[in-house]
Amino acid sequence: PIVCWSIEAFERNDRVSDIIVVVNERVSNMVNMLIDEAGYTKVRAVIPGGSERVDSTRSALDLLKQAGIPDGAKILIHDSVRPFVEQQSIDGCIDSLDQFNAATVAYASTDTILLTEDLGERKVVRSVPDRTNAFRAQTPQAFRFGTITKAYELATADPDFHPTDDTRVVVDYLPNEPVAIVAGSETNLKITTQADMPIAENIARSLDPEHAKQEAKARMHAVFAEAFSQMHKH
């Protein structure tokens, strides 16, 4: 399953000491079973997430705070639906926290990005940023524990708090805190729709060349079928 691919990426990294898995409560029993079967040694807890991403992050941060994690600890937050994250991205995040208090994996955009605004009932182009400075955010996103908890404390007090990811929380609420860019990759795909399936199958085959084409395709279809089945239950 997708979540296992993501866990394994961090499980096999010697620099990662502990893993917390945040999942929808509906599938927590299944995830616990998969973790037990795989024998992951770094998973310390499987906890229920919230209705939105930021709620899930806060649940994990609260658990870490209760455990007495020091402010200087390095924390990496990853989308479990990015199962093809590379070791160099994980290492890059960890290394970046030696110099910065926040970092994110990102991939240089090959598309022109348009910033828009409302004009009546239509969206119109407000500006076109230089593409050399445009990146697509990926994960992991990395923080010193004290930095991300402080950002969330400030954000929680804001009634207009609606960020899309954890880096955005730091950028918005700790504007003087630089966030370093760690080189990502095109294969660090976020699997969210059926349209992502053929791309994910190709990536899976490239990572597992010993498997035949049809075998890899069948495996990925089974994974996605289960994932989408769970999504439709929500």
Report residues per predicted region.
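A generic "binding-loop/recognition-motif" signal
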Residues: 27, 80-81, 109, 185-187
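Hydrophobic packing residues within well-ordered alpha-helices of enzyme cores
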Residues: 31-32, 93, 200
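Short, flexible, basic/aromatic active-site loop/helix in glycosyltransferases
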Residues: 115-143
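Conserved beta-loop-beta/alpha segment of the NTase-like Rossmann-fold superfamily
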Residues: 51-119, 138
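Conserved N-terminal catalytic core of the sugar/cofactor nucleotidyltransferase
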Residues: 4-72, 158
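Residues at the starts of beta-strands that form the adenosine-phosphate
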Residues: 17-19, 101-102, 178
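Conserved alpha/beta core of the MobA/IspD/sugar-nucleotide pyrophosphorylase nucleotidyltransferase superfamily
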Residues: 134-234
